[in-house]
């Protein structure tokens, strides 16, 4: 049980450091393993590629903020449900990020993103 909680805290810290604090190189140094496998079709494999991507993204969207709504862990996987906004007035995007950890380090990543619509077919939120 302690390992699951540690993995959740690792993912929370990684997302916060890389995107909200705008320090992706620091996040990679602290929380990513020597191999980083990327399944996002817009991002290449490798820790250095992630740093370049996140640095460019932060430059393009300096007000980017990720609100972590929930984090779930099972085995070596951690799933984070996120609200991602590019600027404060933005409705944002709902994100589901899946991380695989090995020895308390992030080694693999998948994600699915969906814009938050102006109107929904129900009265529920995406969060």
Which functions belong to the PLM regions below?
Residues 1-127:
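C-terminal and inter-domain tail/linker signature
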